[in-house]
Curated annotation (Swiss-Prot):
Gene transcribed to yield this protein: dsbB1
UniProt keyword Transmembrane helix, yes or no: yes
InterPro entries linked to this entry: DiS_bond_form_DsbB/BdbC (IPR003752), Disulphide_bond_form_DsbB (IPR022920), DsbB (IPR050183), DsbB-like_sf (IPR023380)
Compartments (UniProt record): Cell inner membrane
Taxonomic source organism: Pseudomonas savastanoi pv. phaseolicola (strain 1448A / Race 6)
Stretches assigned to the Cytoplasmic side: 1-14, 65-71, 164-169
One Gene Ontology cellular component annotation held by this UniProt entry: plasma membrane
Source organism, top-level taxon: Bacteria
Intrachain disulfide bonds: 41-44, 102-130
NCBIfam families in the record: PRK02110.1
Membrane-spanning residues: 15-31, 50-64, 72-89, 145-163
Name of this protein: Disulfide bond formation protein B 1
Membrane topology: Multi-pass membrane protein
Segments on the Periplasmic face: 32-49, 90-144
Amino acid sequence: MSDNTLYLRREKRFLVLLGIICLALIGGALYMQIVLGEAPCPLCILQRYALLFIAIFAFIGAAMSGRRGVTVCETLVTLSALGGIAAAGRHVWILAHPSDSCGIDVLQPIVDGLPLATLFPTGFQVSGFCTTPYPPVLGLSLAQWALAAFVLTAVLVPACIIRNRRKPY
């Protein structure tokens, strides 16, 4: 087996793991919403969409046979993570400055108008406010944890691409 094939297999395993982690995070968010009664705000829902897009693109990338297709999917994963950084970063800002609003009047109809909100309203429909403080998990708010996950994804996926695409001389 060539080095390129080994690197590609490693990237595909990483993408599968990333997709599983994103689905687990969405499952955790649904658990907190349904069982613990923590209502999601518009920014929470946008973060769920970002996680879902990361998972979808990661699984598609893992199923690709060529290096170019995997790279395209990894680029889409990174772009989805950047979208998640924007939503989670804004959410962290709002939690730090409670006088600001997440714009529920502006964002709610937009987020509730997205297709998944009608197909799966329990998981993708807005029912809360961004300024609602929930108990921290290991000292960080859920928005801070989401921001950390999106930043890690946005850094590690391109790092994986760069490391595996370098040609040893």
